[in-house]
Amino acid sequence: MYGWINIDKPCGISSASVVSRVKKILNVKKVGYAGTLDPLASGILPIAIGEATKLMPYAVDVQKSYIFTVQWGEQRTTDDASGEIIKKSNIVPHFEEINKIIPNFIGMIEQVPPNFSAIHVDGVRAFKLARNGQEFELSSRYVNVVRLKLLSFSRENNTADFYLLCKKGVYVRSIARDLGIRLGCFGYVAKLRRVRVGYFKQKNAITLDKLKILHNNGDTHKYLLPLWYVLQDIKHLDDVFCSVEISKIKNGQNIQLNNLYMVKNCDMCYVSTHSVPVAICSIANNVIKPVRVFNV
């Protein structure tokens, strides 16, 4: 079995736990996920099965969308609801004040990851150091926020809902924290849902319970997405090469290209034969070179 599953992760379990559940349901060993979702977060978690794990970079380095709620008035150790309160404020921000500062959080922005994150500090995960009460500082880095929009605001609950479209590496918890600091009222993520990861969207996502039902009924086609699902931006060459050339590609050998019109203006391609995956290849100087070969 190989391909992708668009899992709708529930709140309360880790991304690693989802992988364990999928392994048990499908009785497969080679499973991975693209883009960690915190235990308190829900939403889209792309799951790679079998040879699809070789394509993880194509599922991770994509735009992602989130809907999240910020609770104003407190700063917490984890920058979400699970942490301890470290600062408080009685200031209640106004809708106009929030909207006014949003442009500062769009584009290439400098961001410091939360201390409770998977960033390495001298070879140790930051969250492990934070749990042990060790003091350390994480370096800031530049990340790309494509869009940040204030959806709603509640003075009664002192909360605000946001829509975020961003690229790889953005921490939603850091955005909530920094919004609160800029407004002078503090803030943390009270609720977080990922609604899109590249081509993985809510409309075809399934729960773990639904996956179990479909698998037990033998309805593999209703949940397993094809290997090429994350390669829709790459040139697809199906039944272009002869059997000898396909054998060479499978063995990692380069192939001289004669029909340049088929691969004009591209440096990568996905090769298949009779719709069966063969390899991801690079293209340069009229030569195709296997980069990732699939064993299917």
Curated annotation (Swiss-Prot):
The record's catalysed reaction(s) read: uridine(55) in tRNA = pseudouridine(55) in tRNA
Query: In terms of domain of life, where is this protein from?
Result: Bacteria
- Gene Ontology biological-process entries: mRNA pseudouridine synthesis; tRNA pseudouridine synthesis
**Active site: residue positions:** 38
Q: Which Pfam families match?
A: TruB_C_2 (PF16198), TruB_N (PF01509)
**InterPro entries, per this entry?**
PsdUridine_synth_cat_dom_sf, PsdUridine_synth_N, tRNA_psdUridine_synth_TruB, TruB_C
GO molecular function, a single term: RNA binding
Identify the enzyme class. Answer: isomerase
Keywords (A to Z) from UniProt: Isomerase, tRNA processing
Q: What's the EC number here? A: 5.4.99.25
Please report which protein family the annotation says this sequence is part of. Answer: Belongs to the pseudouridine synthase TruB family. Type 1 subfamily.
Explain the purpose of this protein: Responsible for synthesis of pseudouridine from uracil-55 in the psi GC loop of transfer RNAs.
Q: Which HAMAP family does UniProt cross-reference here?
A: TruB_bact (MF_01080)
Its protein name is tRNA pseudouridine synthase B
What is the organism lineage in this UniProt record? Bacteria, Pseudomonadati, Pseudomonadota, Alphaproteobacteria, Rickettsiales
Gene name of the encoded protein: truB
